[in-house]
Amino acid sequence: MVVLITRQHPPEVTGYFAFKSYLSTILNENNLSSAFLEKYRVLAFPLMNPDGVDLGHWRHNAGGIDLNRDWSVYNQKEIKTTVDFISKTLKENDSKLVLGIDFHSTYYDVFYTNEERASTSMPYFLDNWFSSLESTIPNYKVNEQPSVSKQPVSKGWFLNAHKAVGVVYEIGDDTPRDRIKIIGKESAISMMKIMLD
């Protein structure tokens, strides 16, 4: 199973635009997407923080909490509901979560990844994915910043709770909209090809 989430932080809309392009590509109903969806279930959460968005908050929800710091504590309803739904879906379908991507925005395009890869179900996925992105997106250089997840953030939860590859996929605030569509589309195509290989 693959999990895609976005809008934990309300104003980070360029990440949401990449999420839309990514998800639309997966649901494209062509041979590649059909084969991928035959093999993998995708759970997509397009608005993790509806109250924060509605209230115009910068990083937190209606309770004043940054949702991307609650992924092992589960004090916030948004995270608890999401985690419960993912867990229920995995159990009902006897599935395994292999990849989780959390779309955000920041000053520039960057992928925040976990240093730990060997213990995941796809230890070479990121290397293959990033190599593919650089070869398919014109003038694109992957900016990866791996770290050990010490805070209760989504990428750490994907790794620690499920041994899945976890990525925080950040799009630059000023990345042009047409470029975001290309990056989102090519990222999804590359992911599907790698995971079907």
Q: PLM ranges: what are they?
A:
Residues 1-135, 139-143, 166-173:
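Active-site/substrate-binding loop(s) of hydrolase catalytic cores
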